[in-house]
Amino acid sequence: MKRLLLLMIVFFGGIVQVVAENTLFYDSKQLTCDLITSICQDKDGFIWIGTDYGLNKFNGIQFTHYYNNPKDSTSLSDNSVKALMLDNEGTLWVGGIGGLQYYVPEENAFRTIKFEESSSFHIMCITQLRSGEIWVGSSGRGIFRIRKDTGTGEQMTDIPDVSEHAHYGVIYEDRHGSIWIGVNGTGLLRYDPSTRTSKIYTRAVLDGGSTISGMAEDHSGNFLLSTGTTAYYYDRENDRFTKIEHNESWLPARSILVSQKGTRYLATFGKGLKVIQPDLKELRSEVITLPFIDVDNAKIRAIYEDHNQNLWIGCYHRGMVMVSKESTPFHFWSVPTREYPQAGVITALYKDDDGHIVSGVEGEGVFKITSEGNITCLLYTSPSPRDRT
């Protein structure tokens, strides 16, 4: 794999020894698809992974795949899964292009929710309010309240400024009882159930507000918001959103996760994983060292923390990364990619009498490396592709 010095592995700038993450990686060889959209853990500890082509259940050892079977009404309604949610009763809900379903583990089957109209519904998000009600946002069909006992969805028409024709990508209830709704193409809507009033925060006050991608509250009660281009925190006293500074020219944020320890992660599409600093004033990159994927530039569509505080990162077009909370005893060394841009996989390893590591690296040649991981010299340079022809 390109630029991997698999001594233990390549990472960044100049054969530097760094502590590695204890990680696992799964791609399309194990998953139904590497286009990951959503992640959730059920009451039995299984990790569910939604993709653009099928649903996966992971028991810690192997994956079970779920697809749509037109001849089986209890199968997945459509192979494109967009949202997963575990409710307070331990029921797993699955939303996607084929509508809304919930999983019945005793039967290993899915039950489909019926909506008022017979045509299919594209479900974009699922959330459960503190009252126990389950709301789903759809693409072009409005917002629905779900009744599991009757297996039906009822369109909500009593929320001001909510249109049955709009696209709703995110719904979140904060600790103050306000319900925040991301309206694609419009902005952010805040609904107060106690007064039945709404307020719209348009694209004029939210950069990238035409796409609301994520919402969360941290342990201090700060309401955090991500859009298609940046991230904000809500100044409740002044009823305004303040942009969180970063050093990127463009930041396509996709979701927010507040970990059990209080770390505030921001997943981005092509800019890797960021962390919102404690003072809410700055975003910094979260450095994750992996031998098989460059997380710093990954297109992260989904991020999730399981019961054991392991971090699951869904990298679009690449696969699933699991970062354990337990560190590994191994270390990685990296090759300076600017000086050695053609460095590939390790082809040979040898330790000489002086304690130096002599390593053959495909595409560059033979390096002599100290026990501290510093390159002392290039013993042999590989001929260029032109010279080899």
Residue ranges and their predicted role:
Residues 1-389:
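Carboxylate-rich, polar loop motifs that coordinate divalent cations or form catalytic acidic clusters
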